[in-house]
Amino acid sequence: MPHTDYLFTSESVTEGHPDKMADQISDAVLDAVLAQDKKGRVACETLLKTGYVMIAGEITTTARIEYPKLAREVVKRIGYVSGDMGFDGNTCGVLVAVDQQSPDIGQGVDVGGAGDQGMMFGYACDETNELMPAPIQYAHAVTRQLAKARRGGLDFLRPDGKSQVTVEYRGGKVARIDTVVVSTQHSESVSNRKLHAALREEVIAKALPKKLVDRKTKVFINPTGRFVIGGPMGDTGVTGRKIIVDTYGGMGRHGGGAFSGKDPSKVDRSAAYMGRYIAKNVVAAGLARRCEVQVAYAIGVAEPVSVMVETFGTAAVPEERIAQAVREVFGLTPKQIIEGLDLLRPVYEKTAAYGHFGRTEKEFSWERTDKKDALRDAAGGKVRAVAGA
């Protein structure tokens, strides 16, 4: 029998974490290409270390991109604007090594085939209003609030930071928050006492549901003691190293492919978005309390080689009917995914921090639940939709 009483932990990082800086620069490049050339092909990687940014990849486009200017603008938006922080977007060096996409790949993609082989997963559950796992959703809430507090007056905070939230489950359902960890870069001058008090009052208390935090909830703030050296000065940042933060916090499987810096012809990204769209609509329709979808592709081939639906014993109708309904309602070729989710818009930099899923902004088309009625009808299920979904 599956465990029903357990602890589950997920982490999030702020936009100023060096790996997330790399993701945002890569996606800013993608947005700049799509804004000028919707047929552009982008596979952009970024690396950051003390004082410099390196942008590399394969980009085929008619767009004119000022890579150094673009990278520095992203760094400054994040908040690294002074050498005192260990990184300065005004003065950092930018090295560019960009080539065109291989024509061997292009010949398959241009006729609507997948840009690579691989398997992608989507997941949804009824633990939160956003139909996301509670641990990752609450971890993101903490890091978003940390950034908001930094911009809202806590000037001793710096852009780099992380959170970790452990949720206690009883009977398979969220019962309480057991542990919260917050680590944030800060100025040399701020005292630990002032920092801890501010983070408890302005970050943790405002980010997490009060009904889930009790006197037994453990809170750790900068457990190593101090966190003055951070950002790219403290750690090298590389695109695609926070794929679990980007998705479901470890709850639900991951195919291994990163998202940022990839145009929608790369099914690593677009099919993972479609997987989330499908799973969320299954849960929103009331067909299951938990749903995971796997799709897999061969490079240059349009139709997926496999589609699987897993509901972990929570289905309200036979799982085979849900799987058949998914095939009837959703188009799963790269072309159908791109058109159905309107993925050729320059919206990707926003996805590159605080998760690609569970977001409420209108740009996140894969978060819509507009297929729930069609799914319910196709599955033949007389079930009640999730409230508010």
Swiss-Prot record:
Enzyme class: transferase
Cofactor: Mg(2+); K(+)
Subcellular location: Cytoplasm
Claim: Transferase is one of the keywords in the record: yes
Region (Flexible loop): 101-111
Cofactor binding, note field: Binds 2 divalent ions per subunit.
Reactions mediated catalytically: L-methionine + ATP + H2O = S-adenosyl-L-methionine + phosphate + diphosphate
KW Translocase (keyword) present: no
CC terms in the record's Gene Ontology section: cytoplasm
Domain of life, source organism: Bacteria
UniProt keywords, alphabetically: ATP-binding, Cytoplasm, Magnesium, Metal-binding, Nucleotide-binding, One-carbon metabolism, Potassium, Transferase
A Pfam family: S-AdoMet_synt_M
GO-annotated molecular function: ATP binding; magnesium ion binding; methionine adenosyltransferase activity
Binding of ATP, residues: H17, D160, G161, K162, R226, F227, D235, R241, K242, A258, K262
Record-level GO BP terms: one-carbon metabolic process; S-adenosylmethionine biosynthetic process
Xref: PROSITE patterns: ADOMET_SYNTHASE_1 (PS00376), ADOMET_SYNTHASE_2 (PS00377)
Binding positions for L-methionine per the UniProt entry: E58, Q101, D235, K266
Major location (coarse): cytoplasm
Subunit structure: Homotetramer; dimer of dimers.
Protein task: Catalyzes the formation of S-adenosylmethionine (AdoMet) from methionine and ATP. The overall synthetic reaction is composed of two sequential steps, AdoMet formation and the subsequent tripolyphosphate hydrolysis which occurs prior to release of AdoMet from the enzyme.
Family: Belongs to the AdoMet synthase family.
NCBIfam families: metK
Record protein name field: S-adenosylmethionine synthase
